[in-house]
Each structure stands twice: as C-alpha cells, then as structure tokens.
Amino acid sequence: MKLLCCSKFLLLFLLLSTLLFASEPKKSAIVYYGSDISYPVVGIHDYIIVEPNNIDVYRHGFEVYTKKMYAYVSIGEIDPNDPAFEKLNKNLIVGKNRAWKSHLLDITDPAYKEFLFKEMIEPQIQRGFQNFFFDTLDSYQLIAKTKEQRTKSEAALVDIIHTFHTKYPHAKLILNRGFEILDKVHSDITAVLFESYYQGVGGKELRYKKVSKADRDWLDIYLNKAKAYNLDIICIDYLPLEKLPTDANKLVKKIETKGFIPYIATRELDSYGYSSKNALKREILTLIDESKYDRTYLESHQVGALPLEYQGYIQKLYNVAQKPLPSIAQMQQYGGVIIWLTNNYKEEDKLIEWIKKLQHYNIKVLFMGSFSITNPSLLTSLGIYTSDVKDTKETNYKVIQQSKLIGFEVEPPKTPLTSYIQIRDGKALYTIENEKQQSSTLAAIMPWGGFAIDQSATVEISQDNLWVANPFALFKEALRLQDIPVPDTTTQNGRRILFSHIDGDGIMNRVEWNPELFSGDTIYSDILTQYSIPISVSVIGAEINNNGLYPKLAPQLQKIVKKMYALENVEPATHTFTHPFFWNKIENGDLDPKYRLKPKGYKFSLDYEIKGMLDEINENFLAANKYPKAKTVFWSGDCAPPKNILRYVYKNKILNINGGDTYISNLHPWLSYVAPMGLERDGYYQIYTGEQNENIYTNEWLGPYWGFKKVVQTFKLTDKPRRLKPIDIYYHLYSGSKRASLNALKYVYNWAIKQDVNPIFTSEYIPKVMDYYTVSISKTDHSQYLIAGMRNLKTLRFDTLAFKDIELQKNIAGYKKNQTESYLHLGEKTKVILNAQQTKKQAYLISSNGTITQLSRGTKSIQLKLQAHTPLELELFVPKECKLSLQPKAKKIQKENNTVTIVYTKQKEATVNVQCRE
C-alpha cells in the first residue's frame, strides 16, 4: 500500500489542585494502512482512515467504530494487486505511475466512473463501510498536459464526488487535497487531508526531509480556502520510526497552532503514530509457545490475563512457535511485554536485542518463570549477571531482601537454585543468600522492566497454582502501567451484575421422585416460574427434535421448551444440535460421530449446529412477539472453539459464551481459580462464563448433588477483596432431575436475589465483555480523560482512595463509592469525558437495578429514564435545594439526609427528574 498522494465528577489519582474547566478534547485523526488493526489504539480518534481490504469487518471493533472509519479509495489510479484490478476494463489504462508501480486510469471515461462505484466503492459499502477517503485526486495531472484536458479531468472529479454524495447522502467523505475542485465540492465533503507541512518525504527513495517555507506558503493559499469553508483539515507529517518518541509530540503542537488536525507517522503508514489525542496503550503482548499445548491451557493465559484485565489492560497472546518476534513498528500498539514461555526461545540473541530496542519506545518487558534462554551471558546487557551453583541440592538459604510484593498467596518455597543471579541498576524484590554469602536475586524491577523466576512468581502446591508474587503489583511496577479508568464488566449502575444461563443437557432426564416428569418440567415449575430474574435457557437440538435421539419423547420435550420460552424472563439460546465434545476435531467441515451425539442419519454441518439451531428455535419454539430472540450459542464439550469457528459466529452476528474455569472456593481460595473474561483468537473473542457450572461442584455429576451450593462461596470470593466477576448462576437442565441438585439451585437463587444486584440477560452481558476489549482511552495534558467505545459497557471503575468529586458531565449519570472500589455510571452515549474539576454538589444516581435508556443533564437538572427486568429500584443523591419528580409515582420512597431510595412494586420503567434551584 502506498503513501498518501505525495505532491472525576469522580476523578483519578492524587489530584492536588483543582483545574479550570477542561473543554471538549481536540479532534484527532489516524491513518493506518496495516493489517490486524488495534481498536483500543485507533478508537479514540475522530477520523480513522484505513485500507479497507486489510480490515476484518466481522470483528467487534469494526462494528463499534465504523461511523468514524474511512475506507481508502484511490481515484484515477489502481494497484495491480488490488482485488478490483481483475474486473477492470484494461482500455481504461492510459499510463503508469512508475513511482508507485500503479496504473493511471482515464477518469473522463464514463466507464471509469461506473467501474469506480461498482467495483471499488459499492463492495466496501456492502462490507459495512459508511465513509470514504479519496486519495490520488491529482493523478490526472500526470497525463492531462493541456488546460483543456485538465479542465475535463477536474469536471470528471467533481461529477464523481457529486454522484457519491447523491448516491450515499449519509456517507462522509475526505479528500486528499483536491484543491483545484474545492470550490465546487466543499459542501459534499467533511474534511480535507494533506501531507508534508513541516516534515515530508521525497525523491525516488522517499527519504524523509524537511519541507521548505516556500512549499508551506503555497499550501497555505489553498488551506486557507478550506478553512473558509469550515472544513476540518488533517495534516500528515512524516518522521522515521526512531524519531517518533522524541519529536512527534513537538510536531503535533506545532501543527495544532496552524489550526490543523495533526497526524505524525512513518511514511509506510502501517504503524501507529501521534495526533492531538493518543490512546493509552492497553494491550500487553504476552509471548507464549503453543507447540505443545493450546493457549487455553497455558499458565500465561489461565492466571496471567486476569490481573491485567482487573487493571484495565488486555492480554494479547503471541505464539512464537509459529511467528517471528514482531517488528519494532508492529510493537507501537503495546503498553508492555510479558515473556512467559514454557520452552527456551530458539533465537535467544535476537530476543535480547529486541528487548533492548523496545526501550527506546518505553515498552517494558517482564520475564515470568524463567529467562527462556540457554546462554545466560546474553543477560549481561540487561544488567543481569549469573554464575553456576555448585551444590544443586542446597536449600539452606536465608532471605536477605523481600518486598511486600512477594508472599501474596504463599511464601516463596525453598528449592534448589540453578544459578546465582546478581543485578545492576535494579530494585531487588526477592533475594536469598546461602551460608557462604552467595546471593541470588530471583525477582526484581529493572530499568527495562523486570523478572520473577524460579518459583518467585507462581508455585504449584498439591495441584493448586498459587501466586508467590502479587500479580497486580508486579505487572504494574515492572511494566510501568498507568492507573486508568477501568471499563468494568462486573457492575452496572452501582450494582453487581447478575445473570443466569442454562446449558441444555438432560432436558429429558426423568425426575427421581416422579418418573412421569422430566428435568425440564421441574426447572420450569420450580425455577423459571418462581424466580423472575432474567434466565437464559439453551437446548440441544438432538435431544428435543423429531429427527434427534428421542423421537418418541420429542413432542413432550418440545412442549416443555415452548412453555419455557413463553416466559417473559426467559431468553432462548442454543447448545448446538449434537453437542460437539471437542471443537478442534472439526476438520473440513465434518466431525467424527465419536466426538458428538449421534442422531440417526445426521451428516454434520457447522451451520446447522449453530445458526440452524437458532433459526429453528426462533421459527418453531417462539411466539412471533417474543423478545429477546435466540442469538447466542452456549459452547458445548471442551468449550474451546478454534478461530475459524469463532469467526463463523462473529460473521453471522451470533453471540457466544462458555469456557473459563472460575470456581474459587473456601477450600481453594486462590486467584488461579478465577478465569479471565475471555480468550482471543485472531481478533475474535470467546467469552467466558462468570462462574463454573454445577458439574464442577458435584465432581462431574458423581456427587454430592447438593454441591452447587458451594458456588455461593465463589460468588463471595469474586466480590471481595476485589470484585473480579459478576454473579453467573450457570448450570444444566439435568439439575432438575434430583432433589439435592434442585434444592441447591433454589439455595443459590435465593442467596443471589438478596444481594445488591442488577439482573440482566446473558445476551446483555456478552457485548459488555466484547466492548472491554475494544474500548479506547485517552488522557490529555490536563488530567482529562476521554473514553470511547462504551457502547454496551456502561461502567468505569476507580480505586476509591484515588477519587475526588468533580463535575458531572453530559454522559455521566452518577457514581457509587464502595470501600475499595468506586463505580461511575454512564448514559446511553458511547463516549464520555472526565474532567478534573471540583464543583458544588449535583444530583446524581447512586445505584439502580435497571439500565439507563436516556440521560439528560443540565447544570441544575438531571433527567433519567430507566428500564429494568424486575420491578425498578434506584437510589439517588438529591441535594436539599432540589426537587424530585417521578413518572410513574412509586409507592415506596425513603429519604435519609440527601439520599432518596425508590422502590417500585410492579413497574419496571420510570422517568426521574431532579430540578435544582440556583
């Protein structure tokens, strides 16, 4: 791809002084033509210009940010590698741009216009792009030598742009320069882009160079015209990669003074540069080796992702067994690196050099478990010196240095050392010494990052994996992670999220105390109709369909399913047709019957297993007016879908959940028993459950059958000392077949509904997690935060000790302070601005069991519309000079000081108005 044409109300952290009101953040832009786009990096910008053929439109981030994305289209030129080239009438080729090895096309020929719209623009519209960036508008000048030819070409450009605006009236359009036609098309476009104002590229080799004042003066003539039309003007300047960290921000400020939106990047435009706003780098690259085990089963994922996620960061797993180390340009999206390899890295000298190069870009590196090399002398360049241990069985060591960071769940074990380790210019976290005063530092913070090796990070005891180091503190200190507002998936409007989902297994199991009943009957009568909270129920097609395993029982089972799905509080879902046991065994679209259920005559089809089942549920088991419809697959078997299957569900807009082993208990109160929120494969996320199902708590359904009661321990331990998970009551339909298991369900539900919760459907939880992985956060020089991409995820979490009252902004409904964590509630908009300014008290929402569907806030007022799945409850802070009104009126209103508690007995929707006097 070539270059562009070259011619607190609550806020954060230790704020010691009140700041003046911070205005709307400056507009920013990014131009990224690479592949594997990072939405946490680009999402914050107002203009996101991309090479559309490098964008996977099925990934969640595209759906979140598509309104701000602009698809690149070259006008009057075409690259031979462009997919549209095959469909080009070659008679349109009238020349060659040798600098770019592209073909010049006759834009005055009506056939070109037809080709442009049919083969280059419309396919991208169909893929989901809404906005476009027209490049190479001046290519015609290479072939139009006479004034008449130029006039004709410019008229053709104007016609193309007018046609685009007429054909796609809601689309936005950016032009690269186009100065010659600006007077005729300015009303059809949103912005003008140009390049090389102070720093550009030139010559055959496109070398970086300074731009002359004469060239800037020439540009200013045309740019002033664009300003007069009130168009945004995007200026791209170019710097070598190694100069970006030191020079880019200076250049940004310089360009801003001219009234332009700056973007500073390398000439390739395939890494992330700098603009007026820049995203905090939330992604942490984690090097892994999947040559033996899939990432699902690696310690790096199972225990390493959660501490990052809790602090607002994202683990990005990178398999070095299949790919070389990323280039330094590719590393610009990352906030740090964790090396967590189970084998030594083969090209260890390259690994060390790579780490050293990253330091110029302030990307820190943390070694976990080992240094992953065989030649320890390579470590000397990192300030680490090793010597051999003569007595490899010696364990008589004393501790001479131990940070508070060490000894988190267990003290470091006394095990034999493999080498003595000394450090230079670092802070030792854990150092031991033998009787000969030979010392070894096993964990340290270093100028380039840090390390925790030889069981100073984690240790296995009785098959439990325990943290020796505090992972929250270790990751933060070693990688120099900033404290940031954390997009939080556990809480909504100040209350812990509660959802419940049921895997469809065993609907046909006979009830042990009444063989006339099926387990589906008792789940319906004793659970679904008795607890009004949202519950998502899946079915296995082969268990209930006429062409399934039980054709004689099918009519009765289908009747049960229809009764379940007729309930207002029940959401339908699929647990597939044949319950695949091992998803990675699907080869060439087929799955051997030994890896699934075996209905007679069935030929395996992935499409039928998932989308086909959802369609059948919606068409055959739901009333026409039933909402929500079935749109979620609950993974079966090993719950480990490979990337091609994840891509399938995203392509078909199907939600997914299951997997992850969260079953921390009083007997096993270790962080390793709490799973992360999900697992990424090639940009697609498998969403994990909140907690595990009853199969785990009953020893794989061998007993005790009351064992699911212990999930309450899990709920408690994932709430304090840190709220790590929502409450997810997750089980199988076969739990309705035994008294002990059914009573356990009642015990769990009864406990859950007594908590301070916000009940939602499973299909409402899943998109919150999907949002987490694409939210983009920026911090300005004035301690102002801008958070974008909060589409379904509506909570930001802060450390309570770091909070200060600040002005409540447009999209902020309120907040709730708990002992250690405080939660900020957002309105229906996807963007929020947090300004550090203390102000007098305003009315705000403290908590609610509902969802905010509309928020309107003035300087002296707030209006909220809320909708809940159960009778609405809310708590408000209402200053005494303010008046509260409700529609409809509530029967129970309790006031204590400035706190008003409102409880409805039936209504699930209400409008709240608070108006305050001057």
Residue spans of the language-model regions?
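Non-catalytic C-terminal accessory domains or segments of carbohydrate-active enzymes
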Residues: 367, 751, 756-918
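Metal-dependent polysaccharide deacetylase catalytic core of the NodB/CE4 family, i.e.
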Residues: 96-108, 285, 361, 368-380, ...
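C-terminal domain-boundary segment and adjacent tail
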Residues: 261-278, 314-321, 477-494, 522-523, ...
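Helical hinge/lid and interdomain linker segments adjacent to catalytic or ligand-binding clefts
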Residues: 33-46, 52-53, 294-374, 503
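A glycine-rich, often tryptophan-bearing local segment used as a flexible ligand/cofactor-contacting loop or short
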Residues: 345-418, 422
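A glycine-centered loop/beta-turn motif at secondary-structure junctions
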Residues: 279-284, 334, 400-496
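Catalytic grooves of carbohydrate-active enzymes
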Residues: 227-240, 483-512, 528, 607, ...
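Active-site beta->alpha N-cap acidic-glycine motif
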Residues: 331, 463-569, 619-638
